[in-house]
């Protein structure tokens, strides 16, 4: 077959020179770079999933339940229990990972001539998804401590009048939390909708922004995922919680039968075993505290985190430091922020290997 490159294709001009999103997938002993839950699913969950798939396999010649009604019922029950906010399936929408959730929201509320504003550094897919939906992305820098500078944030929102504002809490890659008071201040000055990205909410003791939904029915959407705390990254299931009108909006842009029967069934099984799965959250939180404390003892600067990862520095060359960890068999994440790296919290043995490497690397003055 004739060899061609992207430059030979009639690609959209704004995509030329861009790079595909993705963390390195390398064959190393210790992988702490993608914020997965390191604990495998329980035997009971696996057995339940196998039995469920066996049951539905004879119906795979049929399209799946188009609107994922049973799954949305289960998600609503979980959110009601986890946040204390009473919701029903009419408040829930599910898709293939929170990335598809965010993409659908941008398709419905962004687009040509519209803007989305986010506080950087934050989840790197926000500007990528904005570009893919022809939505102009406005990046507002966080403060030196990586927290949102509220004075700057409110001033920029008033000046730029964005159609969408992203607030990620706990923030990825830094792990800090934006308070409900500050989220309300943002909502009150934002002319359009505010999407609060709570992908890591289960790791944080801070209250969920879902508690504000009744107060701001036309402006607030809370996005979540089952990829992190739920030990379900391979299942690719994201969802949002909002007023039912927002579900009506994304139904205008969603693809037909977008969630497969297998995805829906697997997510329902995971929710059925949520007590066991989420039992690992406390273990990971304890390990996060231990890892952060040890890094500080070694002389690293650590950003306070309420997630399943730790953001740390300061390095004069963070990529050289990343390579030094990799050379010691530990894969962590260089997210491109000067002087800093991010490590996912793994099982104790993985964290020990990471900390042993960190103890050696601090002496290299990288």
Curated annotation (Swiss-Prot):
Pathway: Amino-acid biosynthesis; L-histidine biosynthesis; L-histidine from 5-phospho-alpha-D-ribose 1-diphosphate: step 7/9. Its cofactor is pyridoxal 5'-phosphate. It is an enzyme of class 2 (transferase). The modification N6-(pyridoxal phosphate)lysine is found at residue 228. It catalyses: L-histidinol phosphate + 2-oxoglutarate = 3-(imidazol-4-yl)-2-oxopropyl phosphate + L-glutamate. Its EC number is 2.6.1.9. Keywords: Amino-acid biosynthesis, Aminotransferase, Histidine biosynthesis, Pyridoxal phosphate, Transferase. InterPro entries: Aminotransferase_I/II_large, HisP_aminotrans, PyrdxlP-dep_Trfase, PyrdxlP-dep_Trfase_major, PyrdxlP-dep_Trfase_small. It comes from the Bacteria. It holds the Pfam family Aminotran_1_2. One of its GO terms (biological process) is L-histidine biosynthetic process. GO terms for molecular function: histidinol-phosphate transaminase activity; pyridoxal phosphate binding. PANTHER family: HISTIDINOL-PHOSPHATE AMINOTRANSFERASE (PTHR42885:SF2), HISTIDINOL-PHOSPHATE AMINOTRANSFERASE-RELATED (PTHR42885). Homodimer. Belongs to the class-II pyridoxal-phosphate-dependent aminotransferase family. Histidinol-phosphate aminotransferase subfamily. This is Histidinol-phosphate aminotransferase. It comes from Corynebacterium glutamicum (strain R). The gene is hisC.
């Amino acid at each position: 077959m004739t060899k061609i490159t992207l430059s030979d294709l009639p690609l959209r001009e704004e995509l030329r020179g861009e790079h595909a999103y993705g963390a390195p997938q390398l064959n190393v002993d210790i992988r702490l770079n993608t914020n997965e839950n390191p604990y495998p699913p329980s035997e009971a969950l696996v057995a339940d999933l196998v039995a469920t798939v066996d049951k539905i396999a004879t119906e795979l010649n049929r399209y799946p339940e188009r609107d994922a009604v049973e799954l949305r019922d289960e998600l609503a029950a979980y959110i009601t229990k986890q946040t204390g906010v009473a919701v029903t399936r009419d408040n829930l929408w599910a898709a293939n990972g929170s990335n598809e959730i965010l993409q659908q929201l941008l398709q419905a509320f962004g687009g040509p001539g519209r803007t989305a504003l986010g506080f950087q550094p934050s989840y790197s897919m926000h500007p990528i998804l904005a570009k893919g939906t022809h939505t102009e992305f406005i990046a507002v820098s966080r403060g030196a401590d990586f927290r949102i500078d509220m004075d700057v944030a409110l001033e920029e929102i008033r000046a730029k009048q964005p159609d969408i504002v992203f607030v990620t809490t706990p923030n990825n890659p830094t792990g800090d939390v934006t308070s409900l008071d500050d989220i309300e201040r943002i909502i009150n000055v934002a002319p359009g909708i505010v999407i609060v990205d709570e992908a890591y909410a289960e790791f944080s003791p801070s209250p969920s922004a879902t508690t504000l939904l009744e107060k701001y029915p036309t402006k607030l959407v809370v996005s979540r995922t089952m990829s992190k705390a739920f030990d379900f990254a391979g299942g690719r299931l994201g969802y949002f919680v909002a007023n039912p009108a927002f579900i009506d909006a994304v139904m205008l842009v969603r693809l037909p039968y977008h969630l497969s029967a297998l995805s829906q069934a697997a997510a329902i099984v995971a929710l059925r075993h949520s007590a066991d799965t989420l039992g690992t959250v406390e273990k990971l939180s304890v390990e996060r505290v231990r890892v952060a404390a040890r890094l500080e003892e070694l002389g690293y600067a650590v950003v306070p985190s309420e997630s399943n990862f730790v953001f740390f520095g300061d390095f004069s060359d963070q990529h050289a430091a990343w390579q030094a960890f990799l050379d010691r068999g530990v894969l962590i994440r260089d997210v491109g922020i000067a002087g800093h790296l991010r490590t996912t919290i793994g099982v104790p043995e993985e964290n020990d290997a990471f900390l042993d490497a960190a103890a050696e690397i601090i002496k290299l003055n990288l």
